[in-house]
Amino acid sequence: MKIRPTICCAALLALCSCNTTPQKPQHADALSLSNPVTRKQAIKTAYAYVNLKWEATSNNRLHGLDPNGQHVDTPDADAAPQLGSAMWWKPGTNYGMPYKWGGFDTPEEFLLRLAQESPVYAGDYASDSKVAGGDDAVSSYAAGIDCSGLVSRCWNLPRPYSTRELGGLCVQLQDFSELQPGDIALKPGTHVILFDSWVDDAHSVFYAVEAGGVPHWKCYRYRISIETLKRLGYTPHRYKNIR
């Protein structure tokens, strides 16, 4: 399976990029645990987001109000001078599903939505106003996925679970060295990343997959150290229904 690897030297920033995910009920309903997933399936799903090839046009760009009056800022490269270098996609061919605040699209749904004639905007980054607005700031006209939405898809969950809820579906591991493919590093209310594989035999650095903001607002694969995760207050977790 082809991987488009991204090695992120600024992992510290990446892990702080999503701020608070849209808030949903904090309890974990029993339905979620009726959807078992294998580790191989979880990673295959993650790669599908990282490697997604899609075509953009200028019509998929918006920095303003959608038809419902919701403010949207797509992470397109033309916005980089105003919104920072993490803005990345351009009209034409792109790789990696863009980050969308409150997003839960599958790769297939994302491509179908972009093919529609009605307004569909490619991504919507986690601005301060999005963080403040929570669920009320989600645009139904933007397409993409956010950090907890990506993990929810990789685990075959029936709906998007927030970073505050995911821990309720898991057992917390005693140590990061126990991480296996499809497990997560979690900071509730802030961000979540998916464990892919170890970089070294010492289990001090691993490849992660996330929907984040550095170096770009998109789904990508990169390396992160356990030392960094511990310093930032992340803990290792395992979904109860992963096999």
Regions inferred by a protein language model and the residue ranges of each:
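N-terminal capping segments
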Residues: 22-148
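Low-complexity, Gly/Ser/Thr/Pro-rich intrinsically disordered linker/tail segments
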Residues: 219-243
